[in-house]
Amino acid sequence: GKDHPETGATLTNLGNAWGSLGDYEKQKDFLTRALEIKEKHYGKDHPSTGATLTNLGNAWGSLGDYEKQKDFLTRALEIKEKHYGKDHPSTGVTLGSLGNAWGSLGDYEKQKDFLTRALEIDEKHYGKDHPETGATLTNLGNAWGSLGDYEKKKDLLTRALEINEKHYGKD
């Protein structure tokens, strides 16, 4: 039926597919419907609800509404920390997205703080040489640059480059 949890899962996947195709308006619409179903069936603080909140927050960010992105990601982070803990990889993904939202809103100090936490989780769970760690290093380096610490930015981006070249090659 229209409100069945499996329908919610399909709506989530379809929303993410639209996001991959660059249609963030459709992504947002499908994820909003999915969120309504998940909140109704699982509750407002269920891990599945948290995952959809993360995706929906990022959809809002892709649409340029960083305030809504931050709000959805903040809710998602609370759920993930409660259910998975403060150092779980899924928590780290949301921390990274929330850090980038804060950066888009111009609060580079908060961006740095959230990305630093995300980096600690990435290094612990994936290792210091993993591409996920490299992506977080890139974002964190840019945050430091926005704060005016170009030496720190250079160091972090150099580490990210080494990881990327190791995993993807120099070409």
Predicted regions and their residues:
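"A position-specific structural signal for the A-helix of alpha-solenoid helical repeats
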Residues: T12-N13, S48, T54-N55, S90, ...
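Helix N-cap/loop-to-helix boundary motif
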Residues: G1-G8, Y42-G50, Y84-G92, Y126-G134, ...
